[in-house]
UniProtKB/Swiss-Prot annotation:
The keyword Nucleotide-binding applies. InterPro entries: DUF520, UPF0234-like_C, UPF0234_N, YajQ-like_sf. PANTHER family: UPF0234 PROTEIN YAJQ. GO terms for cellular component: cytosol. SUPFAM superfamilies: YajQ-like (SSF89963). It comes from Streptomyces avermitilis (strain ATCC 31267 / DSM 46492 / JCM 5070 / NBRC 14893 / NCIMB 12804 / NRRL 8165 / MA-4680). This is Nucleotide-binding protein SAV_4896.
Amino acid sequence: MADSSFDIVSKVERQEVDNALNQAAKEISQRYDFKNVGASIAWSGEKILMQANSEERVKAILDVFETKLIKRGISLKALDAGEPQLSGKEYKIFASIEEGISQENAKKVAKVIRDEGPKGVKAQVQGDELRVSSKSRDDLQAVQALLKGQDFDFALQFVNYR
């Protein structure tokens, strides 16, 4: 019987992030507590720029955006938001979307699979993803359940299950 395998990745659909950003921008433009505070959220290159005239308002914009991301099914572990910075008369927060599994994080996941996973399961690092293979599909499902129970500081998705 051939080996079964799946890939562990950390990817975010850019379109879903864009939809969440547009929904947040619409809510910010319509909410009463954001009137006359210069509140806005928009793409700034590959980063997301949130700005308002007070620190509390810019944190509220971040909260609205996080709520929209959750509703769109995007893990907040993929969002890397900085601290509010004063720039002139406005406060700004720059946030970026983290994608890919770093070598260091891939080694952590592989170690968890080796130490706590079923015997006969192999994990190989392939660039910014991890390939997990085994003779038994049940073992692969046990590995998925194990990893879902772990609290990593990055988002994980399981793809390419064969």
